[in-house]
Every structure is written in structure tokens, then in C-alpha cells.
Amino acid sequence: MFEFLDRHPDFEAKLRAFKKRIVALEKKGKKLLTGNGKPCAKAKKKPAGNAEAAARKEALFQKQVRNNVNRIMKRTGWDFDSTREKMLATIERTGCTPTEFFLYRFYELTEEEQDTYYIAKYQKLFQKKYGTNKDFVSLLYDKERTNNYFAEYVRRPWCVNTKVSFEEFCETFKDTERVMYKPIAGHRGYGVEAIYLTPETMKDIYDRLVTYPEGVVEAFIKQHPEMCKLSPTSVNSLRFVTFSSNTVPVTPDGKMMDIAYSIVRFGREGSIVDNLHSGGMVANVDLETGCLATDGADRNGDLWVTHPDTGVTIKGFRIPYFEEAREMVKDAIATRKVEGYIGWDIAISENGPMLLEVNDRPGSDGLQTAPAQAKQGMKFLMEKYM
């Protein structure tokens, strides 16, 4: 009757589990977000005892240690105990996470080389120093509110699956061949689906979508032909990471807004998402030229001179409409008076840039994954904001 594309093999099971989780929360008087995107009064979680919370935190840490030690063992042939010992000693000295120890190849580096890396603990410093407004952060965790707030930059039809009639759905997507469903508070591409639309299947698709957890349904972006060379199935995106303030300079030379860096993310064959954590790849972008400044890298930290599926050479590839995308981010910060340490995800369509998402925790792995094999971190790039 109709075709849902690129669904994870366990999608139906995961969807059922997600719905059960929502029902369970609601029975306890809890809800993730109210209509204005803020936690409802009953949703406030009672703090667990210190011992219980510490035990959960320690269990999660040990799981991350085991997983990443095993990944290193497969790569190096080292034994478990010595690898774990080296990891824990480095974590104690630097404050890195087990995943950073693996991804940035800290097990191969001297202490001096390790100290060149911008690691997760510095993100917490930025979040504290630049203090993104809590109301703005709550907005970013609600895709409906984000799309409304930055409407002039979204530039594509969209709706909320639980708040649209069939007639409105048809009118919104009358000229659309495919749509994307995204959970309202989803992240890292989890739960995203691409769906073909035809006049004959419109009602069936609508009836199916309204049973999903609340989310946004957007017209699938027809990306620029040049971006398709990186991956034709995923919507490949630029990320700009910015620092901005309305009251104090964010750089030593007095700038109130600055773009720290940009990366591009692109998917693998058959995937509709480009996130590094969902199997995609990443490369750094030269902020002046819009050309890729590094080879590509995957979530294992392996480098690719050419894309393994399309064969295109990655380093030197020029992003179309890069200048327009960069200026769009600056304009959004200025017109919405955005403050804080923010990541902006931009797609490049045939007609120019479109805003995908805005993030208050843009991460550090995308910036340093590709340069990792050169044993040179990017802390030097971020020090002026510290």
C-alpha cells in the first residue's frame, strides 16, 4: 500500500517499547514536556539517594570502560588488564571519557599529545561560562517549538503528527514526494523515518503517523546535487559551532559572536541519517573557503580518503552555498539574540541552506575524529573561549 523507507529492523519493537514507556510515565503522573516545552509540575523526579545514584553512575562508567577496552583490544591485540589499566590511568590524569580514550587513540599518544585534545570536560566549562538561557534550552528540546521560533530559516513545509487533520496534512504536503518523521525530542537521528507519499497512499500514511509518538513531519529535503556526491541517500549536513553573548565579549579581541568551527557529516549507503553515532562519517570544514580540510572519519576513528560508497575524494570537496549557510547562522543569532555555546545543523538544498536543528550540547568528537590519526588535538582552536 505504501512504503516506509530505511526503517531499523527493530523499529516496530522499539516503537512499542517507547509507547509503553510513555504510558508508564503518564500513569505515574509524569510527562516529558508540556505544551510549552517545559517539564510539568509532576514530572520533577525525586532525587535518588546518593548511594543509589553513585552506584548507577559507577555501573555506567564500568560498562563504558569494558566496551572501549574491547574495541582497543580488537585493534591492537593487547590484553584486557593492561589496556584497562592504561585507560584508567589516563582518565585519572586527563579527565577524558572511556570513549574519548578510544576515539582519539590516547592509548597510542604521549601525555603531551593527549593534552592537545579538547575533551568533554571543557564542554561543561563552556556551558557554565556562557550559560545558555534555560527557557531557550527547553525550546531546543522540542522540535515543534524550535521550528516555530526559527521559522524563516527552516524553509520547508512541516507539521506535528498529533496536531494535524487529514485535510491539513494533504494541503501541507500536496507538492511533496517524501516526508521525514522525527520524534519531538529525538536526538542523534534515533527514531527518524523517511516515507514516500502518493495521492493513493496519503490516507494510509496519515493514519499510521498519528499513532506514532508526538513528532514533527517535514518535507524531505532535496539536497544539492553536489552534496549527493558525499552520500545520495542521507541528508548530509553542516554543523557550525558558535559562541555568543548579548552582554560580554566571547573572544579576547572583543567579539560578541564567533563561529568556532564547522564540520560536515554524511551518511553511508542506504542510510537516511548522517550522524557519526548512527554510522555516518565526518570531516572538518575550512571556515573561509567552505572546502573540506581533512579526510573523512567514522565512529571508530578510521580515516577514509574517498567515500567508501560513492568514491568521491573527501579532502578538498567544496560545500555549495557555504557562505550563505554561514551568514544564515550569524543572522539567526543576531535576530533571535541567541546566547551560549550552540551547534547549528544546516542542510544544503538545491536552492540554498535550510536549518535542520539547533543544539545546546554540540559535542567535541566531530571536530577531532578526523585529525586524530595525526596525533594533534584541536584544543588550541578552543582555548580563546575558555
Label for each model-derived stretch:
Residues 1-61:
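Intrinsically disordered, low-structural-confidence terminal and linker regions
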Residues 52-172, 329:
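Conserved N-proximal alpha/beta basic substrate-recognition cap immediately N-terminal to
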Residues 167, 188-191, 249, 270-271, ...:
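Short catalytic/ligand-binding loop motif for oxyanion handling, primarily in non-cytosolic enzymes
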Residues 198-295:
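Phosphate-binding site of ATP-dependent enzymes
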Residues 288-308:
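A glycine-rich, aromatic-flanked flexible loop/lid motif
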